[in-house]
Regions:
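Matrix-facing interhelical linker segments
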Residues: 1-315
Length: 315
């Protein structure tokens, strides 16, 4: 929640549900999908920038292709450059996401580019009084992005190793243990462990870095003359009027005026969002599994098939 004056923090989901219901009644069903177009554009722009920089410099775009410390540092530098370039457009996308549909005109699909370029042109001295120059936002945004990325990769690898170790220990006690299994063989169970580790790491990163994102989002929104829905009532709108000088000033002001819980404003919305993500993943996995079973030729399972389905643990 980017507004610092709201009384309801909505740290748990159930306090947010009545407000969301009122927003739906007063607006329309798309109120929770605001900014989805610009968000997708910014994500696509990020991938495009990474691809261009990678092809221009020869730096690895994927961390799995890093075979040395130098290549790892090049990969991290590529990520930093990409995040820095898209920061102005991320700011524009964030405004579209949080602004009220009642008090603001609905943005066109490509307005994110116009607003992003405007912030680049106002690099040093923004035309709007309280807006921070984009260079003052780039460093904390890049720092958050790269730290979150490295933490995600690290936790994912650790989780994957733990899950494989648990499964390996379980199957070593069974008759299916076979050390001569081909390590290069593809197995859907390996992919299942990788998916679970990726989901767990993603959820953990969203929760851990939520307070930092709250601060950075407030810096992005400051001075943009954005009017947001009043989430205390769900029936009115309020402007965002802040005057932070930077990341630490925003952090200290939040702690002083709102307490530590002010860093977790809107955490209940994140819980609902993650629950929706898990539901979609579960539903998609179920549908794909059912379709795969329907397309498979009828075949009675054998003990050999069962053994092969478990040997993936020893690669």
């Amino acid at each position: 929640m980017v507004h610092n004056g709201l009384k309801n923090f909505h740290i748990v989901p159930y306090t947010l549900l009545p407000v969301v219901a009122r927003l739906h009644r007063r607006q329309d069903v798309t109120t929770l999908w605001k900014g989805i177009g610009s968000t997708c554009i910014v994500k696509g722009l990020n991938l495009a920038v990474e691809d261009v920089v990678s092809k221009g410099t020869g730096w690895p775009k994927e961390i799995g292709k890093c075979d040395s410390v130098l290549q790892f540092l090049q990969h991290i530098t590529l990520k930093c450059i990409s995040l820095a370039i898209i920061t102005p457009f991320y700011s524009a996308s964030l405004v579209e996401t949080v602004q009220s549909d009642i008090a603001s005109d609905k943005p066109a699909l490509l307005d994110v580019f116009r607003e992003g370029f405007m912030r680049i042109l106002e690099w040093g001295t923004p035309s709007r009084g309280r807006m921070l120059p984009i260079w003052a936002i780039v460093f904390p945004t890049v720092s958050l992005g790269i730290t979150k990325y490295l933490a995600h990769i690290t936790l994912k690898n650790i989780t994957e190793r733990v899950l494989r170790f648990q499964q390996r220990h379980r199957h070593e006690l069974s008759d299916s243990y076979n050390v001569n299994y081909n390590k290069n063989s593809a197995n859907p169970l390996i992919e299942d462990i990788s998916l679970k580790a990726n989901i767990f790491s993603f959820i953990a990163m969203e929760i851990i870095f939520f307070p930092v994102e709250t601060i950075i989002h407030r810096l992005h929104i400051q001075g943009t003359r954005t009017i947001v829905d009043n989430l205390d009532t769900g029936t009115s709108v309020i402007p965002i009027l802040t005057g932070y000088e930077g990341f630490m000033d925003c952090y200290n002001s939040t702690i002083a005026k709102e307490g530590v819980s002010g860093l977790y404003k809107g955490f209940g919305a994140l819980v609902l969002q993650l629950a929706a993500h898990l539901a979609i993943i579960k539903l998609t996995t179920l549908v794909v599994s059912e379709i795969s079973n329907l397309l498979k030729p009828a075949k009675s399972p054998t003990s050999e098939d069962s053994v092969h389905s478990q040997k993936y643990l020893f690669n």
